[in-house]
Design a protein with these regions (language model features):
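Short, solvent-exposed loop/turn segments at secondary-structure junctions
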Residues: 49-52, 99-102, 114-116
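ADP-ribose/NAD+-binding catalytic cleft of ART/PARP-like enzymes
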Residues: 3-88, 170-171, 178, 185-188
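Active-site regions of enzymes building and remodeling cell-envelope glycoconjugates
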Residues: 105-111
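Active-site and NAD+-binding cores of ADP-ribose-processing enzymes
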Residues: 12-23, 55, 111-193
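Extended catalytic/binding region for NAD+/ADP-ribose chemistry, centered on the ART fold
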Residues: 83-104
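Intrinsically disordered, low-complexity boundary segments flanking structured domains
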Residues: 27-36, 95-100, 152-156, 162
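Short His-Asn-centered micro-motif
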Residues: 46-48, 95-97, 110
Length: 193
């Protein structure tokens, strides 16, 4: 990738600082996006109550459920630990292809360095699958049989509906407001090789 000063194809241009942050992003993810530019909703998205243009953040390792039952959260974590060696409900960044209903602002998400994604094509949101306490272990096992692991965004993009919850396992990520989509598209199209 070569460094550009600005991309002026859109009203919201990419500054040198934004491009410097993009240069830290996982290159394979950027290449996957480049192949998906003609698709709608081709970025990982996350809704938050943050109100900043862009930033780099660390993924919390102690996430607690806000709407889900703690027992269901812990049961799922135990199953994810058995199958994928990660407490995905506590240690993942939750994203989707369409994050408009979560939080006040929607951001485009770019994992930094190594990452992978866990998702179920059959269960869009595990919160909605919460059973009675006595049925939790069996339900969690059933769900985990459908969960897939991939670091190929094109594969995940093609295998999920826009509303599916995607658990991104990474240490840090770059997030930028959705209003930069056109400028990002142009930068990725022209600069990512």
């Amino acid at each position: 990738m070569r460094l550009s000063k600005h991309i002026n194809e859109a009203a919201d241009t990419l500054t040198i600082d934004i491009i410097d942050n993009l240069m830290k992003v996982n290159l394979d993810y950027l290449r996957d996006i480049k192949h998906l530019l003609d698709q709608r909703r081709h970025y990982l998205q996350r809704g938050t109550n943050d109100n900043i243009e862009y930033t780099i953040k660390q993924v919390r390792q102690d996430r607690r459920p806000t709407d889900s039952n703690q027992d269901w959260h812990d049961t799922l974590d135990a199953e994810f630990q058995k199958k994928f060696h990660v407490n995905a409900r506590s240690q993942a960044l939750f994203c989707s292809r369409l994050a408009g209903g979560y939080g006040d602002n929607t951001y485009l998400i770019f994992p930094i360095n190594d990452f992978y994604m866990l998702y179920s094509p059959e269960y869009p949101d595990l919160f909605l699958e919460q059973p009675k306490k006595e049925d939790m272990p069996q339900k969690a096992e059933k769900i985990l049989r459908t969960v897939k692991k991939s670091n190929d965004w094109r594969e995940v993009f093609g295998d999920t509906r826009p509303i599916n919850e995607i658990m991104v396992i990474c240490k840090s990520y770059f997030m930028i407001k959705m209003k930069y989509t056109a400028a990002l598209d142009a930068w990725i199209k022209n600069e990512v090789v």
